[in-house]
Amino acid sequence: MTGNTNAGAPRTLYDKIFDAHVVERSDDGTCILYIDRHLVHEVTSPQAFEGLRMAGRKVRRPDQTIAVPDHNVPTTPDRVNGIENPEGRIQVAELDKNAREFGLNYYPMSDIRQGIVHIVGPEQGWTLPGMTVVCGDSHTATHGAFGALAHGIGTSEVEHVLATQTLIQKKSRNMKVEITGKLRPGVTAKDITLSVIGATGTAGGTGYVIEYCGEAIRDLSMEGRMTVCNMAIEGGARAGLIAPDEKTFEYVKGRPHAPKGAAWEAAQAWWKTLFSDEGAHWDKVVTIRGEDIAPVVTWGTSPEDVLPITGKVPAPEDFEGGKVEAARRSLDYMGLKPGTPLNEIRIDAVFIGSCTNGRIEDLRAAAGILKGHKLAPGVRGMVVPGSGLVRMQAEEEGLDNIFIDAGFEWRLAGCSMCLGMNPDQLAPGERCAATSNRNFEGRMGRGGRTHLMSPVMAAAAGIKGHLTDVRELLAETV
């Protein structure tokens, strides 16, 4: 769906995409928004499909609805029988039934293309610039890396989109996050997105759609851009966007569901208008110098609890207001003492994967650090590719052998340890260096302690047995 994106006053990228999809706008600003792509997984969709049945409705656009099981899916070879939780087993079975009954584009566990929905969508070419994309999952913002307006929705909204291919929504405000200059060696897209959250807080983006821009963002690959946008929700934003460019077009071109021939040329012509105009209004602007960003890790139980690896665990007294008690609770849960150097915190496990960092470039980066090394004694490691195709490509490149030789488990695709909904979990008190997106209490299993970081930082921690500055290992290889 397109629209006149050049008329009137200067507009942001978000303005252009939103305006092009408005079906109807009420006087109070409430809009009916057309949805181009609807992604569904097994956790937030069963009630929505049952609602359709009870109302005697069909899915309005099954051809634009993509279904993938990922949250409950075991990453061991015994896929279906490995689902120990009865509710999880039912959810996966219901998605299978619903996808087949309603004629959706479906990637079951037996399909090599199956994986985490936010990796499968772009991989298959379902995600395109200028689109509206929704899913009953908070990390739908990942797709914003393509210049698509993408965000999570609730189960009742899932039913509404299934039935009407529209969503009722008011427009958010515009926020610009500019990362100027170049990143230093050892600093990655994950460090960018965590540093932004550390600077603005988890409520800094509330009520906004963020556009990420600046030289450091432009320098990122598409996979790096997906990592940045993935965590827009952790910064409180409805969505995160990056304007499409030649890197975007090159990534999309030739994928199974990308336009072909004349349709490609027409689509690309529109995509090239998808940028924020000079003089467009921003309600909030945050600027960070790329050269000031260091490899970072989280120390507490919120993504905003982030510091450079060269720092020390803060004390509750370092904070103000309600954050004093929050810090005290975080330190108690994480079993940390104020003043402890972050690079002395010992770990029990390493998790490399998730919709944040489960793509081929993430695995290459981690393998580059691990090659010729072993996991430290007493540390277990798990590498979970984000899709079956990522896994296959990694094996073609020999990355699996590097991980296995280092002592990691090489798993099948799925959400895995990122959330405690499948067999891959931490034991109470276990501490994990993780490439996922949330470090909440119990996120990776009851009592589990999560430190968020980049794939290269997680790999370095695995080698040393404690949180480590990856730049030290990089210096050793020079």
Curated annotation (Swiss-Prot):
GO terms for molecular function: 3-isopropylmalate dehydratase activity; 4 iron, 4 sulfur cluster binding; metal ion binding. Gene3D superfamilies: Aconitase, domain 3 (3.30.499.10). SUPFAM superfamilies: Aconitase iron-sulfur domain. Transmembrane segments: none annotated. CDD domains: IPMI. [4Fe-4S] cluster binds at C355, C415, C418. It comes from the Bacteria. GO terms for biological process: L-leucine biosynthetic process. Its EC number is 4.2.1.33. Pathway: Amino-acid biosynthesis; L-leucine biosynthesis; L-leucine from 3-methyl-2-oxobutanoate: step 2/4. InterPro entries: 3-IsopropMal_deHydase_lsu, Acnase/IPM_dHydase_lsu_aba_1/3, Acoase/IPM_deHydtase_lsu_aba, Aconitase_4Fe-4S_BS, Aconitase_4Fe-4S_dom, IPM_dehydratase_rel_enz, IPMI_cat. It is an enzyme of class 4 (lyase). Keywords: 4Fe-4S, Amino-acid biosynthesis, Branched-chain amino acid biosynthesis, Iron, Iron-sulfur, Leucine biosynthesis, Lyase, Metal-binding. Pfam families: Aconitase. Catalyzes the isomerization between 2-isopropylmalate and 3-isopropylmalate, via the formation of 2-isopropylmaleate. Heterodimer of LeuC and LeuD. This is 3-isopropylmalate dehydratase large subunit. It comes from Paracoccus denitrificans (strain Pd 1222). The gene is leuC.
